[in-house]
């Protein structure tokens, strides 16, 4: 049965921890996670937007990642209400400033580029926004300790370098 939630759009998503940053290992949760995010809506504070970006990236939803990135990087005013965006100094808004919005935004973008939460597998560009169709990253560390350099063009990988940075036990 449906639960009557007084605040369906609440910004907290801690009940989705298993999906991200956890290993999200249960594919049967995919629809439930998507439903929760759909119900909560997109707009929120900086740190909540960052978490939503990472969750949508983990779902492989590039279009939603793109939409959320636009919300997370829009201009924010210190006089504004509780919504995300960036202040003129590029601090993520809550308001006030909260560092987890900035760190989380970077983590969410990285999750859209590379995922390594499933043992023995690295997924490249799993939720790449269309606006990021060409690019490169250097020095990412994937699980279980693999340094990764990646170039892509037209949303497809064109060059990849992998280097073990620690002995693997996997």
Predicted regions and their residues:
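Well-ordered alpha-helical scaffold segments within catalytic/enzyme domains
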Residues: 17-27, 51-60, 108-117
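Short, surface-exposed connector motifs at secondary-structure boundaries
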Residues: 48-49, 158
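Non-catalytic C-terminal accessory modules of carbohydrate-active enzymes
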Residues: 63-170
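Extended glycan-interaction surfaces of carbohydrate-active proteins
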Residues: 1-46, 67-87
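The tetratricopeptide repeat
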Residues: 47-48, 105
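Short, contiguous acidic/charged loop-to-helix segments that flank catalytic cores in large enzymes
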Residues: 8-9, 39-43, 56, 93-100
């Amino acid at each position: 049965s449906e639960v009557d939630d007084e605040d369906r759009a609440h910004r907290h998503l801690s009940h989705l921890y298993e999906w991200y940053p956890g290993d999200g290992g249960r594919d049967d949760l995919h629809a439930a996670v998507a439903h929760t995010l759909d119900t909560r809506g997109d707009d929120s504070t900086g740190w909540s937007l960052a978490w939503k970006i990472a969750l949508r990236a983990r779902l492989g939803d590039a279009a939603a990642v793109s939409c959320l990135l636009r919300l997370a990087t829009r201009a924010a005013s210190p006089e504004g209400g509780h919504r995300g965006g960036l202040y003129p100094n590029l601090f993520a808004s809550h308001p006030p400033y909260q560092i987890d919005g900035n760190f989380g935004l970077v983590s969410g973008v990285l999750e859209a580029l590379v995922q390594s939460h499933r043992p023995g597998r690295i997924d490249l560009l799993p939720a790449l926004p269309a606006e990021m169709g060409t690019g490169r990253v250097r020095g990412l560390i994937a699980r279980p300790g693999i340094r990764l350099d990646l170039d892509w063009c037209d949303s497809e990988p064109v060059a990849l370098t992998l280097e073990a940075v620690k002995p693997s036990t996997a």
